[in-house]
Amino acid sequence: MAALMRSKDSSCCLLLLAAVLMVESSQIGSSRAKLNSIKSSLGGETPGQAANRSAGMYQGLAFGGSKKGKNLGQAYPCSSDKECEVGRYCHSPHQGSSACMVCRRKKKRCHRDGMCCPSTRCNNGICIPVTESILTPHIPALDGTRHRDRNHGHYSNHDLGWQNLGRPHTKMSHIKGHEGDPCLRSSDCIEGFCCARHFWTKICKPVLHQGEVCTKQRKKGSHGLEIFQRCDCAKGLSCKVWKDATYSSKARLHVCQKI
């Protein structure tokens, strides 16, 4: 009788132990399934890898922001494009003070020619390259029919326009160029303007007045090496270093000053 009771107690203990093991195994399986779902939602990245990736993105943004801030720190106040260096224009926002900004390249939006970089101009709100068509000689229109001179029996020069290509008209030679017009020498421009290089062309540009940025000629004949020339200062002015205590970093900037 006692042996029978002992066998029953041992079988009950075994059943209880088996039940406990089954419950623990089911809990472990569910926890593993949850962990796998979390990993799949992260795209296979561990929490440490995700943290490193976010830290790298933050560092990249911080580097870009510091670079942008450096460029903005180089700008200085202005009131017109003439006060800015070559390759910059005076940007006047609706809110805030005006400052010299880097010129805009071709196919960039613009509102005026001064915003575009040298050798480009603003056309329909877009910076486009300056074509060489403005330098081509005037080609007279051909009538299609040629009439003989009644007195001599020869063709008139007006009808044979193709024989006069490249010969400037006398009326056109007396017209003085305005700002932006093509020229060969300063005498081709109106008073107060000079003929200066604008990349591969030469156009009429205004003579510089007091306070405007100028180019100091260090060597004789170096004017011809400039791609984007400025006119000389007006009479009674000289191109000197701009000395201003508020802008010590711009000590090398030259402006037209009284002699």
UniProtKB/Swiss-Prot annotation:
GO cellular component: extracellular space
Tissue: Expressed in heart, brain, skeletal muscle and lung.
Post-translation changes: May be proteolytically processed by a furin-like protease.
Region (DKK-type Cys-1): 78-127
InterPro entries in the record: Dickkopf_N (IPR006796), DIKK1/2/4_C-subdom1 (IPR048500), DIKK1/2/4_C-subdom2 (IPR048499), DKK1-4 (IPR039863), Dkk2_Cys1 (IPR047303), Dkk2_Cys2 (IPR047302)
GO function terms (MF aspect): co-receptor binding; receptor antagonist activity
SS bonds (residue pairs): C183-C195, C189-C204, C194-C231, C214-C239, C233-C256
UniProt-listed GO biological process terms: negative regulation of canonical Wnt signaling pathway; positive regulation of canonical Wnt signaling pathway; Wnt signaling pathway
Stretches the record annotates as DKK-type Cys-2: 183-256
Record localization: Secreted
Pfam families: Dickkopf_N (PF04706), DIKK1-2-4_C-subdom1 (PF21481), DIKK1-2-4_C-subdom2 (PF21479)
Record key words, sorted: Developmental protein, Disulfide bond, Glycoprotein, Secreted, Signal, Wnt signaling pathway
Glycan-carrying positions: N52
The UniProt record lists the keyword Secreted: yes
CDD domains named in the record: Dkk2_Cys1 (cd23015), Dkk2_Cys2 (cd23273)
Protein origin, superkingdom: Eukaryota
Signal peptide region: 1-33
Subunit structure: Interacts with LRP5 and LRP6.
Function: Antagonizes canonical Wnt signaling by inhibiting LRP5/6 interaction with Wnt and by forming a ternary complex with the transmembrane protein KREMEN that promotes internalization of LRP5/6. DKKs play an important role in vertebrate development, where they locally inhibit Wnt regulated processes such as antero-posterior axial patterning, limb development, somitogenesis and eye formation. In the adult, Dkks are implicated in bone formation and bone disease, cancer and Alzheimer disease.
Family according to the record: Belongs to the dickkopf family.
PANTHER family, A to Z: DICKKOPF-RELATED PROTEIN 2, DICKKOPF3-LIKE 3
Domain observations: The C-terminal cysteine-rich domain mediates interaction with LRP5 and LRP6.
Protein name as annotated: Dickkopf-related protein 2
Native organism taxonomy: Eukaryota, Metazoa, Chordata, Craniata, Vertebrata
